Regions:
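N-terminal mitochondrial targeting presequence
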Residues: 1-34, 41
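Active-site beta->alpha loop and helix N-cap motifs at the rims of alpha/beta catalytic domains
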Residues: 112-191
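C-terminal helical cap(s) of enzyme catalytic domains, especially alpha/beta-barrels
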Residues: 306-325
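Catalytic alpha/beta core domains of metabolic enzymes, predominantly
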Residues: 164-298
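N-terminal small/glycine-rich loop or linker at the start of catalytic domains
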Residues: 42-67, 169-184
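Alpha-helix-loop-beta-strand connector modules within alpha/beta enzyme cores
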Residues: 102-130, 200, 259-266, 320-322
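Active-site mouth loops of central-metabolism enzymes
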Residues: 58-74, 134-147, 186-190, 270-276
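Glycine-rich, proline-tolerant flexible connector loops at the mouths of alpha/beta enzymes
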Residues: 89-112, 242-243, 303-305
Length: 344
């Protein structure tokens, strides 16, 4: 018996040595089993339910040109409308609250807390999902540009304590060309190296915030399985297919089945469809048909299925819920969503 135990110990030591050489085991390595919702999802009980998320405002749209919510009061109203239409989650970005500066992002913890508090006061049931994406540094006007790329987002997570937060899971050249053959904006790099991903994962784990892995391209989808294989992530994993960014994967329904093949079966996934109505709505319908979850809102599109301009995220959610029911499924309640996504 002693020799058997010694043999097992030797094998374990060799394995740990190998993992350390590969820089996988670290002091603060994330273990998603620490989330209180680990293994709480039973596919046999609520597998027909669809998590419907409302993306209320985004980071790029100018409120002077488009009617998007900026202030805590406006965000609370938009969240209430989306909830009443059938959304169980709201995904939010923070905008500069100074007069005339609402077109700029904010990483002020006070802004994040004020917005999330207003939403929770208006609709205590709804799940709040924070953005964490930065291009360059996570700077804030009041910080004097001294923050690093994760400092602002982490400070906002600590202040607002959402149940879910976006985890941008790979880098992307963020590009768009005009019909005239010029750049719509100066080419940008949306940098999300593994080191940054680890930092954000560790922060979310410590705060008991569930990561939602944002995948803008096919290689990022495939990377999630690699993160899992090396121990950086563990199931249950929540994954978002961000479809329609000009330099990412296209918003095409036929892509979804191929992308599903690159996920582990236990992964919970949703489609975020960006663009005009001829691309977004068929893609969202296909996602619902294939068992996925879905997201829409003024961050993702301004257009209803008939091509008319939407007045609010609530109006977009109303149309999305109609599609969910047309394919024979039902939107999940907030309580069901917490079970499905493993936040409870």
């Amino acid at each position: 018996m002693k020799s058997l135990i010694d043999n097992m110990i030797n094998k374990t030591m060799k394995l740990n040595s190998l993992l350390l050489k590969q820089n996988i085991i670290k002091k603060n390595i994330v273990n998603l089993k620490s989330f209180k919702g680990y293994n709480s999802f039973s596919s046999s009980t609520i597998s027909d339910k669809v998590v419907v998320t409302a993306a209320l405002n985004g980071v790029l749209t100018d409120p002077a040109k488009f009617d998007i919510p900026v202030t805590p009061e406006e965000m609370a109203i938009a969240a209430s409308e989306a909830y009443d239409a059938g959304a169980s989650v709201v995904h939010i970005h923070f905008r500069d609250q100074r007069p005339g500066k609402g077109h700029l992002p904010s990483w002020e913890p006070a802004d994040a807390k004020a917005i999330s508090d207003a939403i929770r006061e208006a609709r205590p049931e709804i799940l709040v999902n924070f953005t964490t994406g930065t291009i360059g540094t996570g700077t804030s006007p009041l910080a004097g540009g001294k923050l690093g790329p994760t400092d602002g987002p982490i400070s906002c997570l600590e202040a607002g304590m959402p149940e879910i937060a976006a985890l941008n899971s790979g880098s992307l050249n963020y590009l768009k060309a005009t019909r005239k053959g010029t750049w719509a904006w100066e080419p940008l790099m949306f940098e999300n190296p593994v080191e940054k991903i680890e930092i954000m994962l560790n922060a979310m784990c410590k705060l008991n915030i569930k990561p939602e892995c944002e995948c803008f391209d096919t290689g990022i989808v495939r990377s999630i399985k690699m993160f899992e294989s090396v121990g950086l992530m563990e199931q249950p994993i929540n994954l978002s297919l961000v479809m329609g960014v000009a330099s990412g994967m296209p918003c095409k329904p036929e892509w979804i089945e191929l992308l599903k093949e690159e996920m582990n079966e236990a992964t919970q996934w949703q489609v975020i469809a960006i663009g005009r109505e001829d691309a977004t709505w068929p893609t969202l319908r296909r996602a619902a048909e294939l068992g996925g979850h879905v997201r829409t809102g003024l961050e993702d599109t301004f257009y209803l299925p008939n091509g008319e301009r939407a007045n609010s995220s609530g109006q977009l959610i109303e149309n999305l819920v109609k599609i969910v029911r047309e394919v024979g499924r039902e939107p999940a309640t907030p309580e069901e969503t917490r079970i499905i996504l493993g936040t409870k």
